[in-house]
């Protein structure tokens, strides 16, 4: 490749700190790599039954993100299972995706889970301590019993069993492993029937800063959205993301925009 090695590495570092498969890049004759189009980020309320991808090559195609979002080059920040609902960020900025999704940054993700049975507060203690599965141990979660939230009816509805009641839990994680909430509730004897991600709380603090220092916080919710709807980021959110990537999430912009918890 004829481009200077330093220039190439600098640009790859800008994309993600590593080259991310699936992200839009252009290869010019000179060998330089450039991002295709201005990075864009949106907030989406994923409905039940929708795949967290834009294509489905199965024999019987299922609903995908493409049925709701007609924007190019977007990729989910983390995933929601097909049978899960709620808050999903999508971005064309690979570095931002890494900063928001990687477990090392320990951003909080809150889920409301409708479970089978009537757990007590004591039943939730294993979730708070962390559960060790055969393939990994979970981090301690924030878990509590809540009243039934006011969500739109699910289509199709969950299958009720007349002899078994259901309850709602709020579970907050600082990691996002495959089907983690469902595995955790099943492990303590209360299988999840419906799962909705309701909040993502992003802190500007890096792991190296430690817990003792204050940091700007971006608390993202489903407010203003119905299932299947999406919105672009607000100016405040755009500024937060920009400063998050430059390593100065508590810079001068904080005085202007404040801490939107």
Swiss-Prot record:
Molecular-function GO term, any one: RNA binding
EC number, UniProt record: 5.4.99.-
Catalytic activity: a uridine in RNA = a pseudouridine in RNA
Annotated keywords: Isomerase, RNA-binding
The keyword Nuclease is assigned to this record: no
Enzymatic class: isomerase
Tree of life domain: Bacteria
An individual GO BP term: rRNA processing
Residue positions of the active site: 81 (nucleophile)
Family to which this protein belongs: Belongs to the pseudouridine synthase RsuA family.
PANTHER family: PSEUDOURIDINE SYNTHASE FAMILY PROTEIN-RELATED (PTHR47683), RNA-BINDING S4 DOMAIN-CONTAINING PROTEIN (PTHR47683:SF2)
NCBIfam families for the chain: pseudouridine synthase (TIGR00093)
Protein name as catalogued: Uncharacterized RNA pseudouridine synthase slr0612
Species this chain originates from: Synechocystis sp. (strain ATCC 27184 / PCC 6803 / Kazusa)
Record lineage: Bacteria, Bacillati, Cyanobacteriota, Cyanophyceae, Synechococcales
């Amino acid at each position: 490749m004829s481009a200077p090695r330093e220039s190439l590495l600098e640009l790859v570092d800008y994309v993600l700190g590593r080259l991310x498969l699936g992200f839009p890049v252009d290869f010019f004759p000179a060998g330089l790599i450039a991002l295709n189009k201005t990075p864009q980020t949106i907030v989406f309320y994923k409905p039940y039954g929708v795949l967290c991808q834009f294509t489905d090559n199965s024999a019987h195609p299922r609903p995908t993100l493409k049925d709701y979002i007609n924007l190019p080059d977007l990729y989910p920040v983390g995933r929601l299972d097909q049978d899960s609902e709620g808050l999903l960020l999508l971005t064309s900025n690979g570095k931002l995706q890494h900063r928001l999704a990687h477990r090392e940054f320990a951003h909080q993700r809150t889920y409301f889970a409708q479970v089978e049975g009537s757990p007590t507060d004591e039943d939730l203690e294993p979730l708070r301590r962390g559960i060790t599965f055969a393939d990994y141990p979970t981090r301690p979660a924030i878990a509590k019993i809540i009243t039934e939230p006011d969500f739109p009816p699910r289509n199709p509805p969950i299958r009720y069993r007349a002899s078994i009641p259901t309850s709602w839990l709020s579970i907050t994680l600082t990691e996002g492993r495959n089907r983690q909430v469902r595995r955790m509730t099943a492990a303590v004897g209360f299988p999840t029937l419906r799962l909705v991600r309701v909040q993502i709380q992003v802190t500007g603090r890096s792991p190296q800063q430690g817990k003792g220092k204050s940091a700007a916080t971006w608390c993202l919710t489903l407010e203003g959205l119905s299932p299947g709807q999406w919105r672009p980021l607000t100016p405040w959110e755009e500024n937060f993301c920009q400063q998050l990537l430059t390593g100065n999430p508590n810079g001068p912009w904080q005085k202007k925009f404040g801490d939107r918890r």
